[in-house]
A protein has these predicted regions:
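Generic beta-sheet signal
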Residues: 11-17
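Membrane-proximal, solvent-exposed terminal domains/tails of membrane-associated proteins
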Residues: 103-107, 112, 116-118, 126-138, ...
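Membrane-interfacial amphipathic helices and adjacent loop/beta segments
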Residues: 1-8
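Long, highly charged amphipathic alpha-helices
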Residues: 2, 33, 37, 116, ...
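Structured helix-beta-strand junction loops
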Residues: 9-10, 94
Length: 147
């Protein structure tokens, strides 16, 4: 109910749709149940004009050099780490470059197929992560942004 009211008021809701952690080399399947929960909340609260914004966060450099697969586990938030422990580890140690990429916004209605929506978002996130990890250009639109 709280999520629906928040969306109906025009506010953002942040969902980490993977629901689990990885070292940043792969994108795990996005949980379509989270899209379903958002749709249910939308219907209950009468929220309209809801948009899903696919986002990718990639640690691309360590001490100015590209991050290797082995080094990703030193940066990633993996399983049993607390938020506090993870933030402390990221902020300590070597300098890290982080890239945040925004994909194509996806309008969401209560009638959309949650599995199709989550798969489309997952494909965008995966394509952006692969491009960032390889040092390539982001796929898609001209307005695709990096921070």
């Amino acid at each position: 109910q709280a999520m629906g009211k928040h969306m109906a008021s025009g506010n953002a809701v942040l969902l980490f749709a993977e629901g689990q952690s990885d070292i940043g080399t792969h994108v795990l399947p996005l949980r379509s149940a989270l899209i379903g929960a958002a749709q249910h909340a939308m219907m209950e609260a009468g929220a309209r004009d809801v948009v899903i914004q696919p986002v990718t966060i990639a640690y691309t450099k360590l001490q100015g050099l590209p991050v290797s697969r082995n080094e990703r586990s030193l940066i990633a938030w993996i399983k049993s780490k607390s938020v506090k422990q993870n933030i402390a580890e990221i902020l300590s140690g070597p300098v890290k470059d982080v890239t945040i990429a925004f994909g194509t916004p996806m309008p969401l209605s209560e009638n959309d197929n949650r599995k199709a929506v989550s798969k489309a978002a997952e494909m965008q996130v995966r394509a952006m992560l692969v491009a960032l990890n390889r040092g390539g250009a982001l796929p898609g639109r001209a307005e695709n942004q990096q921070v």
